[in-house]
Amino acid sequence: MATGTEPPQINTGVHGVSRAAISPRHLRTDRWWIAPAMTAGGLLAFIVYSTWRAFANADYYAAPYVSPFYSPCLAENCAPMRGGPNWEIFGSWWGLSPALLILIFPLGFRLTCYYYRKAYYRGFWASPPACAVAEPHKNYTGETRFPLILQNIHRYFFYAAIPVAAILTYDTVLAFRDEHYEWGHMGLGTLVLLVNIVLIWAYTISCHSCRHIIGGRLKHFSKHPVRYRLWGWVGKLNDRHMLLAWASLISVALADFYVYLLASGAFDDPRFF
């Protein structure tokens, strides 16, 4: 019940008392809304596609290729994969798609990624929608409250993303077989998985958390020349983190879609040798 003695609400963020009072929302003359709109559209398209494929629980293995959405396959209801990463850790009681057991780690890594946070904050929440454009929200709390405070677990998702990328690397090695599991062969699917894993590793290593783990908390780089050299290499990749984020997101979706087409019988895998 209101008593009439409540303290007045003080706006924060761009509407705070310490900020200059500018009546127009922005002074930009370009089409600033195109970038956040395209970002939202791209992320929404991936969300719709990955949700469909994750719950489909079908057409994710076409020897010798396995979809990155389903690897490693940890449930008893996984499709048989000769030599593949199908570990029956979860028994017959697990009746849902096995993709739901593993996708939480790479998706959690991307969801808490510094670049993706910027992308969906702007694209979906308009917080802010673009540089030099005021956000529509009256108050701003940043990432200090639930659920956004959970963004701070990004580093731990990075640790989980490393073994997932390693397993996808193993899948790529297995792709140098034919449909009869004979080694020394390569098809278009091998190339698709190879490009995908290179982009996934590049995106993972270019992560801000990886850069800090390698070169952070050092007072004197001269005393740690190896870490300094690695930090410099990761820093160069970090400059292209946004590009690698989108390239790897597209490549993992294309890799899954290619395996889906093969497994569903749309066409046969073209073989190089």
What are the residue ranges of the model-derived segments?
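Membrane-embedded alpha-helical bundles that constitute the cytochrome b-like, heme-associated redox core
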Residues: 2-273
